[in-house]
Amino acid sequence: MKKETQNLQCIPLVISVLSLFGVSSARKPPYLCNRVCGGISIPFPFGIGGKECYLNPWYEVVCNTTTSVPFLSRINRELVNIYLPDPTEYYSNGVVHIKGPVTSSGCSTGTSQPLTPQPLNVAGQGSPYFLTDKNLLMAVGCNVKAVMMDVKSQIIGCESSCDERNSSSQVVRNKICSGNKCCQTRIPEGQPQVIGVNIEIPENKNTTEGGCKVAFLTSNKYSSLNVTEPEEFHSDGYAVVELGWYFDTSDSRVLSPIGCMNVSDASQDGGYGSETICVCSYGYFSGFSYRSCYCNSMGYAGNPFLPGGCVDIDECKLEIGRKRCKDQSCVNKPGWFTCEPKKPGQIKPVFQGVLIGSALLLFAFGIFGLYKFIKKQRRSSRMRVFFRRNGGMLLKQQLARKEGNVEMSKIFSSNELEKATDNFNTNRVLGQGGQGTVYKGMLVDGRIVAVKRSKAMDEDKVEEFINEVVVLAQINHRNIVKLLGCCLETEVPVLVYEFVPNGDLCKRLRDECDDYIMTWEVRLHIAIEIAGALSYLHSAASFPIYHRDIKTTNILLDEKYQVKVSDFGTSRSVTIDQTHLTTQVAGTFGYVDPEYFQSSKFTDKSDVYSFGVVLVELITGKNPSSRVQSEENRGFAAHFVAAVKENRFLDIVDERIKDECNLDQVMAVAKLAKRCLNRKGKKRPNMREVSVELERIRSSSYKSEIHNDDDDDDDDDDEDDQAMELNIEETWDVGMTAPASMFNNGSPASDVEPLVPLRTW
């Protein structure tokens, strides 16, 4: 039965909504209108904009777009605030606060004539406004009498004076205005709604006596400290007035309640409960019948003048629900709530939330841990595959056979090198070339190393690569960069060398610095150390090793400016009984032995030729990578040889050393370089002979005794020699089968990559 009653109640609700808002398909619902102006909320039945936004013109609010100040258009007063009916806040009716007029006299121009503004007019056919009983008539100043106008059959007013005798009694009675400098009085209820305020001068008082005087209606409660200064009220120009508002029941659109219960009906039925959403009270004012509706304060809040405007309050989330239920379960219901005993085993919501959150957190950690484990397993599997593919097992076997050499190369793990290079951070890059990148790193023992990460390696060269690593790891010479080890757990092998801090010889020859000047003595010392290192590689190592890429960019200088021969990327070891090595041509333009270029047979004399070019660089200070232009269009080496033969030696000596050098020594080294550059490898000295000869040249007792037995032969073969030089230059791009990056006519790759081999094994 109750359910049927509720269904029947929905019918008048729908009808009232349609009648109240004049709903049609073409009209916008009032809850979609603008509801704020100047920070003031404008709830329905008030509204801004079109007719669908407010109930009728009496409720229209005009929002000044420039100042964002709201005005009640029908009474032309600035709006301060709007309150919906709320019995809990002592607003049985709706309330609006507006700015009312202030009447003044003698405040600005010095005249005693009162300045009386337009009276406050809230009357009119259908006006829902009236002055509430919270408004008072106040007069502030000395010798001022405030009188309300337009109040028929009554004289309402008050009079203030400046009698100091009343000040003590004023404080005792704790009244704001008791006649001393200000006065106040209540206004009658149920009076017409056009009310003005005038100022009169009391009898037996001078019109100019007392200074500024003001009178006004207000609902504000002022303290006794600030109410006796009339100038402040005059400067403000307004006083806040409270108006009550209601629905006129003669309006056809509000004949049916919006699903609300009448208070009188509720009294007859013994009151209303939580099932009642909103309540309407009825009354009369000055002959008018009105209705005032509000949401049931027992469990609802909102705007009762909108469909569905009164919404249920969830008391379980408020202090009232928590206090009343305490250890019981709070259950929210429409309009109210109940406290029910907890079920056996029921967990508190907070504790339950902690358990669920902890479980989810553990689950997330488990998933993350599983992901990391799988990722680690996959990475380990890949590293094992790379290790086998890159010849790791073969290298282990080779190292096992070399037990006597404790300083053999070490096999680094990928984790070690990632940690050493900060995961191969780009900020650690020392150089970058066509075949790989070199990073500066620091091992766990504090050693600074150069880590070369190659770009590619042929799979059919794995065994050869491992053999070369083992051989190079055995090199132990103070003027040769030490190969510390390698890592085979990456896609391509990573090589680890000792770090050499002071760059390469080529850069030092081009750009001398103040802290280390490349004098002739320094250059000769460097040449001797290079020759000693190459002599060691060719004859003193376990197996003869041919460097195959001797050039100034591969000659590094350590912190003491001692020579370190580097870049063994194209090096080859040979057995004792081998006299040459047949390989794919590799090298750098300007340094390659012409005989090797034609035959592809590399011998120890090929390194001698390249060293001869380095000697020419030390003497001339010029770079062989750029061609020396001459009338005969000779190459760098041929130009030097011709200058020595034609006694133009002083023309090619570096200007920076010409004045301070021992010319006998320079001439001797030049002749030695000429022998190293002989087009016939058999006529070149070996590196041991070159090393001994350079030591003799440096000796203070040395005089030029360089053997030049082959000069005549060279003279006989000048034309062939020149033709050979030209042939090399003309066929360079075709004949060389090594990568193009190795034959850079500009700055060699090693200029920026001193430790990176030009080609990976």
From Swiss-Prot:
Disulfide bonds join C280-C293, C316-C330, C325-C339. The chain crosses the membrane at residues 350-370. It holds the Pfam family GUB_WAK_bind. The modification Phosphotyrosine is found at Y497, Y596. One of its GO terms (molecular function) is polysaccharide binding. The modification Phosphothreonine is found at T583, T588. Residues 27-349 are extracellular. Residues 1-26 form the signal peptide. Keywords: ATP-binding, Disulfide bond, Glycoprotein, Kinase, Membrane, Nucleotide-binding, Phosphoprotein, Serine/threonine-protein kinase, Signal, Transferase, Transmembrane, Transmembrane helix. Expressed in the whole plant. Detected in root-shoot junctions and lateral root initiation sites. Residues 701-761 are annotated as: Disordered. ATP binds at L430, G431, Q432, G433, G434, Q435, G436, T437, V438, K452. Residues 424-697 form the Protein kinase domain. It is a single-pass type I membrane protein. Induction: Induced by INA. Up-regulated in vascular tissues after Na(+), K(+), Cu(2+), Ni(2+) or Zn(2+) exposure. Residues 708-732 have a biased composition (Acidic residues). Glycans are attached at N64, N166, N206, N226, N262. Serine/threonine-protein kinase that may function as a signaling receptor of extracellular matrix component. Plays a role in plant mineral nutrients response. This is Wall-associated receptor kinase-like 4. It comes from Arabidopsis thaliana. The lineage of its organism: Eukaryota, Viridiplantae, Streptophyta, Embryophyta, Tracheophyta.
